From Swiss-Prot:
Keywords: Cytoplasm, Endonuclease, Hydrolase, Nuclease, tRNA processing. Consists of a catalytic RNA component and at least 4-5 protein subunits. It holds the Pfam family RNase_P_p30. Its EC number is 3.1.26.5. It is an enzyme of class 3 (hydrolase). GO terms for biological process: tRNA 5'-leader removal. HAMAP family: RNase_P_3. Part of ribonuclease P, a protein complex that generates mature tRNA molecules by cleaving their 5'-ends. The gene is rnp3. It comes from Methanococcus maripaludis (strain C7 / ATCC BAA-1331). Belongs to the eukaryotic/archaeal RNase P protein component 3 family. This is Ribonuclease P protein component 3.
Length: 232
């Protein structure tokens, strides 16, 4: 069983991976955009991780407002990535993603919206299909004035919905270089300002649980969730 605290970011270079470890992370999900996917890049990041005793898993984020294109991309990249994310914002995309158990994380459901991108129905779908909601801390930090307050409000609203309906939530630094990397304590401290400490702890541990779940499903003896071949 995989344990520890894992960041979600866009860090693939050796210095970045060393920095993540020094800051206190147990591992990370290195995310590529689906239209820039390179097996060579993720393999080199995994090798850097092995060199420094740091777990690196592959992530692919699908970014499109076309639902058919999104579904095709999910099928294409599901077996290429450990963790599959879909960028949200469009309400039809948000809903469809939360209906799909082949997707692990709905990223930024509030993106470019005047609301938080979720309601109680969508939160229930995420809970039923084990699709997590992402809080992208990097996006919050990069925003200014009204946009920052709007994102923060969306985070708070989505946390309330997720907690009520037991929808998984992850928090990510979203870092693309060493200057964007944050320590686990920084993200935990932020979460403590918007929700209770016990729920913050649960959120910090959710990424490793998602990885563990996907690794389990990749086992040759597992046909589907709950159905496993047992050799006598």
């Amino acid at each position: 069983m995989l344990e520890g605290i894992f960041d979600i970011n866009h860090i693939f270079d050796e210095d970045g991976i060393k920095t993540l470890k020094r800051f206190g992370w147990d591992g990370s999900v290195a995310v590529q955009n689906h239209n820039e996917y390179s097996e060579e890049i993720i393999n080199s990041a995994v090798e850097y991780g092995e060199k420094h005793d740091f777990k690196v898993f592959s992530g692919v984020k699908i970014s499109t407002k076309n639902q058919n294109e999104m579904e095709k991309a999910v099928k294409k990249y599901r077996n290429k990535a450990d963790i599959l994310l879909v960028e949200g914002g469009d309400i039809k995309i948000n809903r469809r993603v939360l209906e799909m158990n082949d997707v692990d994380i709905l990223s930024t459901p509030e993106l470019n919206r005047m609301d938080n991108g979720l309601d109680h129905i969508l939160a229930r779908l995420g809970s039923t299909n084990r699709v997590a909601i992402e809080l992208n801390f990097g996006n919050l930090l990069k925003s200014r004035n009204y946009d920052r307050s709007k994102i923060l409000w969306a985070f708070q609203r989505n946390l309330k919905l997720a907690k009520k309906y037991d929808t998984p939530v992850v928090i990510s630094s979203g870092a693309s270089d060493i200057y964007g990397i944050k320590a686990p304590g920084d993200l935990r401290g932020f979460l403590n300002t918007v929700t209770d400490p016990l729920y913050s702890k649960k959120i910090m541990e959710t990424t490793s649980k998602i990885i563990d779940y996907r690794l389990y499903l990749k086992k040759d003896t597992v046909l589907t969730l709950g159905i496993e071949i047992v050799e006598e």
